[in-house]
Amino acid sequence: MPAKEIAFHQGAREAILRGVQTLAEAVAVTLGPKGRNVVIEKSFGSPTITKDGVTVAKEIEVENKFENMGAQMVREVASQTSDKAGDGTTTATVLARALFEEGLKLVAAGHNPMDLKRGIDRAVEVIVAELKKLSKPTQGKKDIAQVGTISANGDETIGNIIAEAMEKVGKEGVITVEEAKGLETTLDVVEGMQFDRGYSSPYFVTNPDRMEAVLEDPFILITEKKISAMADLIPVLEQVARSGKPLLIVAEDVEGEALATLVVNKLRGTLHVCAVKAPGFGDRRKEMLKDIATLTGGNVVAEELGIKLEQLTVKDLGRAKRITIDKENTTIVDGEGKREDIEARIKQIRAQIEETTSDYDREKLQERLAKLVGGVAVINVGAATETEMKEKKARVEDALHATRAAVEEGIVPGGGVAYLRALQALKKLEVPEGDQRFGVAIVQKALEYPARRIAENAGWDGAVVVSRINDGKAAHGFNAASEVFEDLEKAGVIDPTKVSRTALQNAASVASLLLTTEAMVAEKPKKKGAPAGGGMGGMGGMDEMDY
């Protein structure tokens, strides 16, 4: 085991502080609408230019090992906030630094770090409860657009596109972000349920120009079995043919005699039919087939359920208003399943999302939920260069997370004002005499930092701006974009409550841990070994040569 270096007490905490300050300062310059860009060197390719706090934080490593530990702890604050709320990473970093700096002054003056931690925890609980009281639910497209705009660093186009996407697919809908080929940022919406399986044979196509099959008001046969013998299908096909409606067959596979017979009947015009493979694999396939059955009001043909293909009637088949099938995808629009059955299925999937510990499973469950609820939207991000594309795509993803957070827990005034208003609740907080009170005072002071830093980045005196905000009431604060004092809610300067809450909780958690640190252990840097053996005789002067 390599030898270790150990730092103790105040020396250890001061090393942490230097690391925290280094990282926090690089991140804090990006805060607010007048925040500056940070240019990050890459080992290959062009540098990255960003105004995203977590992107900056992830790139920072400090040479001194003890200082680097402090920097990495604050980086964790930014990452955790980004993962949970999607935004607020810079605010969380600024708060973590403020809480640690203010706390360290008191520890150096002889106050008990454990009591300070208890005071910080009590104060944060009260502030979080007050933020929830200040919170208002989002009302319509306008609020969502404003949250998206602020999170995307003031880009109204991004805010409006996200609001439009959420309006079309609903708050449970899937919204994905992809790179566009051109300069324009556009929105594509797929309504209904879409799964990534196309027709089994191009002979099923009804529109040769677009190479797609469109079935109007069709029946849908859903089975998890392979269909190869035609005899199993004949009874139900005869019933469908008599009705004059089209038929979509969703099966593990349709092959051999069955596929050939279906194609011949389609070409002759006897039966308007199309076959597609079932989506997914294994148990996930079974669940997706049940989703399709629930959405369309049909039954899944499965022997374990006692339903056989040859015994099917049209009552067992699903129905939909329209189905479009191309080479790669099948889209079911307006399935005719019972509303209460669909709601029960949605509730079941939501419960599974809550219970699962796997990120992959959660993502797949959310996709299934979105397909049942409303649809999928794709935001295609356009830009002139690859560097701009990366930066813009990251902003769109941040804005998307922030708008989801706003819909989930509501909104509060932005610009750091919500924290300053929530401070009123600390006046009523009863804390035992002693160092816990100083812990509460640390939080009181730290909560001024976000508003102060936003003002400083806009070229104003932070202390003066905070004083003027404190003189105002409710949502009255400093709009750094227009550099005026006004009602921030009316001006559209709002933050998701979840973002403000998560940023404070994560910052307080890490700052408390750092304040109660008494020792640090790091590996000693390895001494460089002696240079390789001496050169050959007669080679003097080699080290003066130019290469």
UniProtKB/Swiss-Prot annotation:
GO CC aspect terms: cytoplasm
GO MF terms held by the record: ATP binding; ATP-dependent protein folding chaperone; isomerase activity; unfolded protein binding
Subcellular location field: Cytoplasm
Alphabetical UniProt keywords: ATP-binding, Chaperone, Cytoplasm, Isomerase, Nucleotide-binding
Record SUPFAM superfamilies: GroEL apical domain-like (SSF52029), GroEL equatorial domain-like (SSF48592), GroEL-intermediate domain like (SSF54849)
Signal peptide: none
CDD domains, per the entry: GroEL (cd03344)
Record field: catalytic activity: ATP + H2O + a folded polypeptide = ADP + phosphate + an unfolded polypeptide
Keyword Nucleotide-binding: yes
Chain residues that bind ATP: 30-33, 51, 87-91, 415, 479-481, 495
UniProt main location, coarse: cytoplasm
Ranges for region Disordered: 525-547
Enzyme class per UniProt: isomerase
One Pfam family in the UniProt entry: Cpn60_TCP1
GO biological process, one term: protein refolding
E.C. designation(s): 5.6.1.7
This protein's record includes keyword rRNA processing: no
Entry similarity comment: Belongs to the chaperonin (HSP60) family.
HAMAP family in the record: CH60
Description of how the protein assembles with itself and partners: Forms a cylinder of 14 subunits composed of two heptameric rings stacked back-to-back. Interacts with the co-chaperonin GroES.
PANTHER family named among the record's database cross-references: 60 KDA HEAT SHOCK PROTEIN, MITOCHONDRIAL
Function text: Together with its co-chaperonin GroES, plays an essential role in assisting protein folding. The GroEL-GroES system forms a nano-cage that allows encapsulation of the non-native substrate proteins and provides a physical environment optimized to promote and accelerate protein folding.
NCBIfam families documented for this protein: GroEL, PRK00013.1, PRK12849.1, PRK12850.1, PRK12851.1
Descriptive protein name: Chaperonin GroEL 1
Origin species: Anaeromyxobacter sp. (strain Fw109-5)
